[in-house]
């Protein structure tokens, strides 16, 4: 779970480091942003398990690991870092900081910083190995994501959702659409 919080913490730094503050020095602004991120980051619920399979041009990539959730800067992220290589991570990002409390369906969209629709989520699959970084992300045509809530347990199963390759990172045959399938279980508490 600490790995998930670290990944979210680093991501939050990237999003807030460019925050405009013309009255302070750059060092003071960065310090203020770091304090804001630290104070707003919290683990949510109890960790479960996740298994994700991504297929691109006949190659299969898998993530098996702990499924956990954190809130930071007003948004919730459910993440599954791989047990054997934590920089290989699947993430679901919500536009609010609330875990699904009842069985719910969300529209998957392309990441938009100004989106505040509580029914929207974004998906990403990232493999940040230094030799061949690969990233795939959802777009506005990816589809729907359903969460089934049964008491304390929250489950999400999906199959054959299409993700778009990052043109910057994915090279050669990996610079193509991919399909992703998975099963996640997380607990409210």
Predicted regions and their residues:
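C-terminal or internal capping secondary-structure element at the end of a domain, subdomain, or sheet
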Residues: 148-189
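N-terminal small/polar-rich segments of proteins
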Residues: 48-69
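Bacterial signal peptide processing site
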Residues: 19-22
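Surface-exposed helix/loop patches within compact recognition domains
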Residues: 69-151, 164
């Amino acid at each position: 779970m600490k790995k998930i919080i670290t990944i979210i913490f680093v991501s939050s730094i990237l999003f807030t480091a460019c925050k405009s503050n013309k009255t302070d020095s750059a060092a003071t602004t960065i310090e203020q942003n770091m304090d804001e991120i630290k104070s707003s980051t919290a683990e949510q619920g109890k960790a479960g398990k996740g298994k994700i399979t991504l297929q691109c041009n006949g190659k299969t990539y898998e993530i098996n690991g702990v499924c956990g959730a954190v809130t930071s800067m007003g948004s919730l992220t459910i993440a599954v870092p791989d047990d054997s290589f934590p920089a290989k991570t699947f993430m679901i990002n919500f536009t609010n900081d609330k875990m699904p409390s009842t069985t719910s369906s969300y529209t998957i969209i392309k990441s938009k910083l100004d989106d505040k629709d509580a029914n929207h989520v974004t998906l990403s699959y990232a493999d940040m190995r230094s030799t061949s970084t690969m990233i795939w992300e959802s777009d506005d045509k990816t589809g729907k994501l359903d969460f089934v809530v049964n008491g304390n347990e929250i489950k999400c199963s999906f199959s054959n959702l299409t993700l778009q390759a990052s043109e910057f990172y994915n090279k050669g045959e990996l610079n193509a659409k991919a399909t992703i399938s998975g099963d996640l279980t997380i607990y409210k508490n």
